[in-house]
Amino acid sequence: KARLMPWKKTGLTFPAEEPASDVEDILEPEIATPEITEVKPREPIAFPWLVMSALLLALMAQRTLEPPDRSIGLAVALYTLAGLAAVIAWFGLRQWSPPPLGEEASQPLPTTLRRTPLLIGCGLLSFAFLAFGGNQFNSFNLTLWLAGGALVMYALWIPDPDASSFGQRMRGWLIRPEWKITITPWTVMVVLSVLLVLFFRFDRLAEVPGEMFSDHAEKLLDVADVLAGEHRIFFPRNTGREAIQFYLTAAVAELFGTGLSFISLKIGTALLGVFALPFIYLLGKEIGNRWVGLFAFLLAGMAYWPNVISRVGLRFPLYPAFAAPTLYFLVRGLRRRNRNDFLLAGLFLGIGLHGYSAARFVPVVVVIAVGIYWLHSQAAGNRRQVIWALVALAFVSLIVFLPLMRYILEDTSGMFGYRALTRLGSVERPLPAPAWQILLSNLWKAWIMMFYDNGGIWVHSVVGRPALDVVTAALYFLGSVLVLARYIRSRNWLDLFLLISIPLLMMPSALSLAFPEENPSLNRTGAAIVPVFILAAIGLESLVHSLRTQMKPIPGRIAAAGVTALLLLWSGVQNYDLVMRQYDRQFMAFAWNTSEIGRVIRGFAESQGNPDSAYVVPYPHWVDTRLVGINAGYPLKDYALWPENFAATLEEPGAKLFILYPKDQDSLAQLQQLYPQGSLQVYDSVRDGKDFYMYYVPPMASDTGG
């Protein structure tokens, strides 16, 4: 038994625990781990050579997969050796093991409820459902909806008999008002980690990425509708979009005074990206320990993948933002057998359905998670109760989803599901191969994207490279091997779910059957960052724990700190370069320079006094003329002027400015014939291939006052 459970000889402490900090207590108390019988510790070895060999082999393997020069065969061989070394280090030499899973609660889930508030809440929700007609939020239906939902939550909520009420705590503080702040090394590490993550997520946010494209114009038009008092439940523009981003951006525009602009979109989505990180920490802590949580928080916070999908200003981070708390509360509810956690999971699940269409697969993930739990021995004595808890979760999520449900039943155009159907079926184009073949191929490509290729979409990725940096990919591989080995040995449902959740959360990308070239994509796989970075953190924590426990105390501490610092530094430097240099250069090379055109038009308007006498002549596959207006500071103005309408500008006596694509010689010839007094200049863009023509027409003589 000791050989099968090696941690009983090496201890579980990683690193030497400081006294529990206020930060940790506020975030979440841990479940007490079972007391471990002390076994005479084995003599510390000089160095855990096999553990470090596994790490070095994994790092070398991933380095060979970095573009442009790749060696797939060598990488497979090195990764195979790394996996074998990790397994031997655990089972053979007992030098390595993942952090142990804490003891799960044994009491069954409660099934009691408060009937009266439940009935009243359901009644209010019925009226709210009717009041949501017309695809509009208003004070009446919102009041009914929120009041009904609050009553249902109260009816299903299980009070904690050991927790004092807010009123009691407030009275106690008023009697003896005092503040107690304890600063420990752990507190300092948490604060520094938060500051580092905020730096990665907000540094140069206004500049990277530096241009908008057509989707941004659509989003800002919807935000303009919100600011104008149009409070839709579902926004049908551009094949339909859920509402959260538009209300969030409107709030940012008003709160920060940024208006209808690219930075308003980016501030909102960057905040959503940060919102997911505390729940990644908490889930890592629930699955492993606080070090797993902190490492997952750091690795995900610095990583290029979640950073770029948060910076681009579209709805992409909404998928992980609400999947992370859903998964955290679901896992905690199953482990602790606490129905309140199921209710919170349902709340975040429902909110996520108002965010990004990829979140529509999360309910399937929740059901599969409960199914995996139900089939394992950890569910003994709790199987019937967990089904009722799942029903409560689904009911709460349905309440939050209620406005969209009303819209779906009322809308006859099928707009809500149109985008998904165009990818899943042959609505827009026939499937290029049998569906099952495409699905298997897509799943494989999505699964290996962490190591090999994250897709070819320049908008939100560095095309053709792995989704993870070298260090994180290697740690993710090692963490996955350790968790898989632990599942084979102990058959704990959580290990299996942690591994299976990754392809499940990638399904919105893999289900692009009609357009397999869109898979993999970092946006539709976004929620997979939650288990991916937790597995990477497990790999790092187990590595450092091995150094601490297998070596003598002082050398072990030094080695653990040094290896951790080196790996995090390597990861941080590469991720910063991926976002701030590689992604930035690639994005700006592909995106059209509407910001430069906007600055030219704004300068013309300020000098000539009339923004309405500047025009952009459209040309196929060139700039979106709506973005020109946004960049010029006139966000609701479309600057397009088609050649057939040139003559209408003769009625304007003032100065005029026409912006043209250099290849559009026909339009230029028409303007020169119409305005022979005009002058042509070439705007020399700072980016290659992005020059444009400026055809300036001076004001008529009578308009100058001469």
Positions of the model-derived regions?
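Membrane-embedded, hydrophobic transmembrane alpha-helices
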Residues: 1-186, 344, 365, 369-372, ...
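Membrane-proximal, lumen/periplasm-facing interface regions of secretory-pathway glyco-
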Residues: 208, 472, 555-643, 686-689
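Transmembrane-helix signature of polytopic, membrane-embedded enzymes
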Residues: 260-263, 280-302, 495-500, 557-560, ...
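Transmembrane-helix motifs of polytopic, lipid-linked glycan transferases
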Residues: 267-287, 325, 477-484
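Specific aromatic-rich, kink-prone transmembrane helix
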Residues: 298, 318-335, 345-349, 502, ...
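Hydrophobic/aromatic-rich transmembrane helices and adjacent perimembrane loops
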Residues: 309-310, 316, 361, 470-473, ...
